[in-house]
Amino acid sequence: MGASATNSVTHPAFTLNVRPDNIGIITIDVVGDKVNTLKAEFADQIATILQQAHALPKLQGLVIVSGKPDSFIAGADITMIAACRTAHDARVLAQKGQSILAQIAAFPVPVVAAIHGACLGGGLELALACHSRICSLDDKTVLGLPEVQLGLLPGSGGTQRLPRLVGVSKALDMILTGKQIRPRQALKMGLVDDVVPRDILLDVAIQRAKAGWLNRRALPWQERLLSGPLGKALLFRIVRKKTLAKTRGHYPAAERIIDVVRKGLDQGGPSGYEAEARAFGELAMSPQSAALRSLFFATTSLKKETGSAATARAIHRVGVLGGGLMGGGIANVTATRAGLPVRIKDINPQGINQALKYTWDALGKRVRSKRMRPTEQQRQMMLISGSTDYRGFERVDIVVEAVFEDLSLKQQMVADIERFGAAHTIFASNTSSLPISQIAALAQRPEQVIGLHYFSPVDKMPLVEVIPHEKTSEETIATTVALARKQGKTAIVVADRAGFYVNRILAPYINEAARCLLDGEPIESVDNALVDFGFPVGPMMLLDEVGIDVATKIMPILVEQLGPRFAAPPSFDVILKDGRKGRKNGRGFYLYSNPTLHSNSTKNSSPTKNGNSPAKRNSFKWRKNKVKPVDSSIYTLLGVTPKAHLGAGVITQRCTMLMLNEAVRCLDESIIRNPRDGDIGAVFGIGFPPFLGGPFRYLDSLGADKVVQALRLLVQQYGERFEPCQRLVTMAEQQQQFYPVDANIDEVTDVAS
């Protein structure tokens, strides 16, 4: 790796080693943390390191590397914002970051960033301030500016340096979406100067520093054209229009990003940096950013929990009962994310083949985009095998059942696993409606039976519900949560009652939307009202995507166990008798010229297949909703004459108030353990607007008294189903909130119910 160092300076997170060839190596290694993040106190340390390097008369260059195995810099420490009480405080924080990175940019000898692992947010802004960037050709290496997903913008110069480096259109795309860029793509767009194998990364970076100042690569002609007055004006007009169409005005960070980038290009760097810091300060104090950051911290804290006081049993092999889309999706995330061998059992070879094809196609997309080598695709596929019998299940630690929603069938599956599996094998049912206690009723080892409810498509939806019944052991809970985490899922533990949590709060929302339709409101008016409110798709479109038959199957169970407030309007029976199942058979609320026979129509389909994933650790993800024509024959079928008359506000209030009320009931009945889990479940499971933070944070923002008042007015207008639950009434009377009023969002990880 080269000559040994002759001089070194160490600070808590930064070490400067000067080699005999006069190249300084600055190593970033935040003590006690698994990944590097930039903290406020590091500003002085960086300044001191740079001053000491500047004082070395023979210094030829600097290389910045990470001391962590697979992390360059994962971003700035978001908890810094919690210390900011005003927009001015946050603005000063941004200005301090700008000042430090300006010192790197102005350093008199070349500074090279040697990037391996995550280089995100403030980490990429630091790399952009360097004079050259070399990154490793490794799956763990990604570059991006994800601040928009937290309701912020890059505050340390990212909005100004990136457009000048890669061009304004590519920069806007990166910053507005928060997307992560892979090494080859980063090289192609000019974000990095070279991509090399990890084992020679430092050597190549040192040679680049020795080479002295290099000419900056010219922008492609398309980007140069867009930098001109006419091209720039056209580009920003198009970008602003598309942004507003996607965000519906709910995410002010996106609009501020456009403004700040434009200002820097029009008025020069100083004006751009000043606008960036000011916008960062104002956005940091916005309710949208507070809500999005609360979701980030909530998911982060949840990932550290086991769901139980027990220690999880080691998982070496996983079984899946049932092929098809759901079984294939579960096998896919188990093999490709958890890295565990999977054995699929189906009654016929076609089901197994379909499950195998699911993963082969998913990995094939990565191969075609050069994000994976064909040999790696083959290696991961070898983790999945299948059979029409139970051979191999004697070595399986946990079995995930994904067969039809038939109680006797699932009970038979439990008996089979107890017969053919190991004595310790856990049986996890992917049921969406059947009580886990009934599935375990005939089990010899009921303590090893649990619910594990995935949402479809499994490889895209981040949430799972873990459902223990009264006899489930603590070890079984901990082991099931551990599997979900290995699969890259965010798991919430919920009680074994009808609908669990997600489907239970979704059902009244769907029912009320259907009642609005029966009141004569056009389908598109209902859907547009809820999309404008912030949901990714409207309830009618949702029913078509999930499958009208699938989505309404749980309603009778909810009525039987929870009461008449869950009774579905008669429209569903009429629609189903007409053979309308939604997109999967080309007949639903909307017209489909080319129905997809294998759309998200499995029993556990999610309300939004593009759900909000923080994950990519974040809670805001843009969606492209294709406008489909309404099937107007459905109005004749239902005997209604469509006419917009309710207004978007009334539609939204009727649907969302029922969802909020039911969420509070779930908390009161201990279906969920705390408001945090309820917020995560709603946002990641049904697409509740992330910028509102989830049902419970939204309730706090409205005030319990205002919500109770609104519900009582709705009772007078529409009936007893809007009666506010007692927990909500009590909170209104005592002026209580679900989250502590004076707590910073990063300090609130849960609130006891």
Curated annotation (Swiss-Prot):
It is found in: Cytoplasm. Its EC number is 4.2.1.17, 5.1.2.3, 1.1.1.35. The record marks E125, E147 as: Important for catalytic activity. It catalyses: a (3S)-3-hydroxyacyl-CoA = a (2E)-enoyl-CoA + H2O; a 4-saturated-(3S)-3-hydroxyacyl-CoA = a (3E)-enoyl-CoA + H2O; a (3S)-3-hydroxyacyl-CoA + NAD(+) = a 3-oxoacyl-CoA + NADH + H(+); (3S)-3-hydroxybutanoyl-CoA = (3R)-3-hydroxybutanoyl-CoA. Residues 8-197 are annotated as: Enoyl-CoA hydratase. Residues 593-622 are annotated as: Disordered. GO terms for biological process: fatty acid beta-oxidation. The keyword Endoplasmic reticulum does not apply. PROSITE patterns: 3HCDH. Pathway: Lipid metabolism; fatty acid beta-oxidation. One of its GO terms (cellular component) is cytoplasm. Its main location: cytoplasm. Residues 599-614 have a biased composition (Low complexity). Keywords: Cytoplasm, Fatty acid metabolism, Isomerase, Lipid degradation, Lipid metabolism, Lyase, Multifunctional enzyme, NAD, Oxidoreductase. Catalyzes the formation of a hydroxyacyl-CoA by addition of water on enoyl-CoA. Also exhibits 3-hydroxyacyl-CoA epimerase and 3-hydroxyacyl-CoA dehydrogenase activities. Heterotetramer of two alpha chains (FadJ) and two beta chains (FadI). In the N-terminal section; belongs to the enoyl-CoA hydratase/isomerase family. PANTHER family: TRIFUNCTIONAL ENZYME SUBUNIT ALPHA, TRIFUNCTIONAL ENZYME SUBUNIT ALPHA, MITOCHONDRIAL. NCBIfam families: FadJ, PRK11154.1. This is Fatty acid oxidation complex subunit alpha. It comes from Yersinia pseudotuberculosis serotype I (strain IP32953).
